[in-house]
């Protein structure tokens, strides 16, 4: 494995065939994102199955992420299709169900007329169009267009500063989550997280279905930034979703929030994704801007586990080129250094201390790899956050753990039989690494595991081993 940083690709109309999904995997996709804000269940099921087939065909671990819409507020539909709101026009956004016209359109947020006040801003399509509330008349919020632009069906609305009372999980989200879990997705992302308690609502649905998978908190609201530390602790991973975040917060604050979120996630051994507009110009062009290349590189330098493509791979003209370009940028950064900003965290847990010790032993002895046996992936994540230049190989008996670790920095995961003894683990390391062809007898590796084997949370062992030697 040469590239350590991971790539998340959003699937959509631009990648909706067996051949295109296979090409995405071959180009470097590590995690496939199913965006439940768009498409229907048939689309998502077909995409999921294509990813699984492509993963098996290539032998590459590819995770599947279900991204829930969350309490996203949207415009309704326009009867005559897309329109253009010009500066100075008056338009009405209504909570009543209606067929939209140029100057009156519905919204999915049925409490807008209650929550809005004169002077509030209403931002459409990630802030491309800006309205100001002039008044309320019954079900209608009357607005003046202050920054005009094109609008079309189902465009998102942001209400910065407004106290939105929507629940963390809508009825649609509950249905989508149930479907995604039954489908077999590996990861779930929750949109518009505001507090650590939001994850409990997701867990309640998961427990009813009878299947828990890691939950990713998407940072998109000012409340999430205010509660960042407790959200990082409560959730399994973090996504810095800069589109809505950049609408809800002053634009100049977003890079600082990104750096703070990445660092805090790493301090707590939680994987972190940086998302939105990373190579946005490649939706239409075969090459990114230099600024976009720098954006991807800086996310890698900050220590992000993964960077994400959205419209570039879902609706863009050059999805494969976007993945290959992102991969080249990541590799160029890593060819210079795999280091990330130093952690201030002082490990206090057994697994935390062991991960630091294993890294130090491996680097000082010039080992060829760190090998971690894992039941849940936790020990591997603790090793990954240290950004060691040594290859990080995870061995697990659980296919779902292999797919979940596809999002974790620098990790290459292998399915092995359930181990029952330390000697069995070491023999399995020899067998797997020699079969891989990148290692030879006599190579030094550092093994991290738990004794007795097979117990979640039992990591307590570091073993320095030369491949092929009977040193149990």
From Swiss-Prot:
GO molecular function: ATP binding; kinase activity; magnesium ion binding; potassium ion binding; pyruvate kinase activity
Keyword entries, A-Z: ATP-binding, Glycolysis, Kinase, Magnesium, Metal-binding, Nucleotide-binding, Potassium, Pyruvate, Transferase
Reaction equations catalysed: pyruvate + ATP = phosphoenolpyruvate + ADP + H(+)
EC number: 2.7.1.40
Residues engaged in binding substrate: 33, 243-244, 276
Residues at which ATP binds: 35-38, 74, 155
Residues holding Mg(2+): 220, 244
Pathway terms, separated by semicolons: Carbohydrate degradation; glycolysis; pyruvate from D-glyceraldehyde 3-phosphate: step 5/5
Family: Belongs to the pyruvate kinase family.
Protein known as: Pyruvate kinase
Originating species: Mycobacterium intracellulare
Gene: pyk
